[in-house]
Amino acid sequence: MGKRGRACVVVLGDLGRSPRMQYHALSLARQASFQVDIVAYGGSIPHEAVLNHPSIHIHTMAQPRFIQYFPKILYPVTLLLKAFIQFTMLLWFLFVKVPAPDIFLVQNPPSVPTLIAVKWASSWRRAAFVVDWHNFGYTLLALSLGRNNLLVSLYRWSENHYGKMATGSLCVTKAMQHELDQNWGVRAKVLYDQPPEFFRPALLEERHELFCRVRKDLCHPIGVYDFISRELENQELNETLFTTKFNADISLKQNRPALVVSSTSWTPDENFGILLEAAVMYDRRVAARSKGSETAEISEEQHHYPNLLFIITGKGPEKEMYEEKIKRLNLRHVAFRTMWLAAEDYPLLLGSADLGVCLHTSSSGLDLPMKVVDMFGCGLPVCSVSYSCIQELVKDGKNGLLFSSSSELADQLLILFKGFPGNCDALMSLKAGAMETGSSGRWATEWEDCAKPLITQVVSQIADS
């Protein structure tokens, strides 16, 4: 495909935290037979499938970290200086360091200075220019500066102006496709996020090995000594919090805690406080019901509410603030752990969990959380914050539940985990729905049907011009 047989994927961010662009690179190499150059920042380690593919070449840019030490009063000046440094660096990589490609595929946002640099490079090197719209960059900037700020207006103009210059466009939802078409003059093709093949339910052996590997992370509570700490102190070598190994046989513990996973970027568009408030409500209600059940004539299995372990993955600016809040909660039936997992272990964690929680609300209201797609790939049902287009992904009552407040989330936790692990029909029903959703589509198929025809078209268009 193409005269040069080469594609360049541009991510002005941490490649390891940009899974969709990693999947694009893999598909360009596997399904379109391109040599693929990725220009991105370093930081987190990408998936081993990307690192080990002989046709994928990663070019790592250095981040202008010194800017973070500027005083906050100079924030607008800092933004402009950072954009100028990034622009200069991008021009060097895209004009000089990377071999000339047939196509540049760029993630948006960030829009400034990425779209300008890639547009210039595509014109200079006679390559197609495709934008993958994940969200709108100006809406993210507006979270910190406000919608009426002059810089936000300039950012939106630049995003619109250069976005319209693309040879082709992809986007993540039908709602975003409609917005781009009606208000931006951009004709985009929807490429839904779909889980790749390594997101699947974990085998018992994989669960046991995973929890052996993360035992050190689980041993360290956030602040107070909790039920997880007590349980781990008394464990035998052949057991984990969730599994027991006897000779070669591995089984799930009947008295295990329920495992709830949430992945967050610890940013203002994800209100983590909702989850903390719901955890407090669950803890208090379970404590009260446990006390009442001492005299009530109700079977233990029917009345049982498990302890909950929330494992929160991700990196971001508000992590320490929320960890301080967790330290002050002093919960008896709920525990929290924060961790950052290897790219190969994250799917195993999702495939071992009982429930996922998504707090993503979207700065634009037009994108969908990829973390939920990954959860469905692992057959994991999700409780998600409700917003304008989330119904394109989460079908309330079928593969997950939608909530708008912490009290709604607390109610959902009580409903889903009543009778856990053996007598929780509501949870099992959602799990079946999540399995069905996850198995109905995979990234390679979606990319072949939606992205590949567009890429073939724009590459041919440039080659013939």
From Swiss-Prot:
Cytoplasmic side stretches: 1-75
GO molecular function: mannosyltransferase activity
Record: glycosylation sites: N238
E.C. number: 2.4.1.-
Lipid bilayer topology: Single-pass membrane protein
Coiled-coil residue windows: none
Residues that span the membrane, as ranges: 76-96
Lumenal side: 97-465
Broadest EC class assigned to this enzyme: transferase
Keywords associated with the record: Endoplasmic reticulum, Glycoprotein, Glycosyltransferase, Membrane, Transferase, Transmembrane, Transmembrane helix
Similarity-based family: Belongs to the glycosyltransferase group 1 family. Glycosyltransferase 33 subfamily.
Protein name: UDP-glycosyltransferase TURAN
Organism: Arabidopsis thaliana (Mouse-ear cress)
